[in-house]
Amino acid sequence: ADKLILPGVGAFPDAMKMLDEAGLTEVIKEQAKKKALMGICLGMQMLFDKSYEFGETEGLGLIPGTVELMHPANDLVIPHIGWNSLEKNEPCKLLESVNDGDYVYFVHSYAAVTDSKNVAAYCDYGMKVPALVMSGNVYGCQFHPEKSGKTGLGILKTFASL
């Protein structure tokens, strides 16, 4: 394959354990040095250094930062489930077909904590949530592009064309 997609639904510690047991952790790290990689939802979270979901678990370390429980303002509940709009932050090829205000679909309780330079787009859910992150040829969508209609398909098509 000339690109990799790391999907994920579930808990960070379990997912990392499964990658480790399958011998895939180092394979993914090595492949990410030479191929475009996209993490989706939990797959995005696993790109970071570590997560604090159910304790502390090391991630893949491909994007600097951590993953922490969200604390939204305005009594918003978690998990954050539903449609939310994107606000562009840093230039990113994956967002070429996306406009500020385009909606994508989220399902998550944890969010990345990383330097703003690694965030291509945020969403607002009572806090600024990194929605699309990047570092070199490694990208991550906290939202589900495959469930996000025209906007999500545009992002996936752009990734496929890299």
Kindly label every feature range from the protein language model.
Residues K3:
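Short, Asp-centered acidic motifs that coordinate Mg2+ and/or phosphate
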Residues G10-I81:
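Cysteine-nucleophile active-site neighborhood
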Residues T66-L162:
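Amide-donor transfer/coupling interface in amidating biosynthetic enzymes
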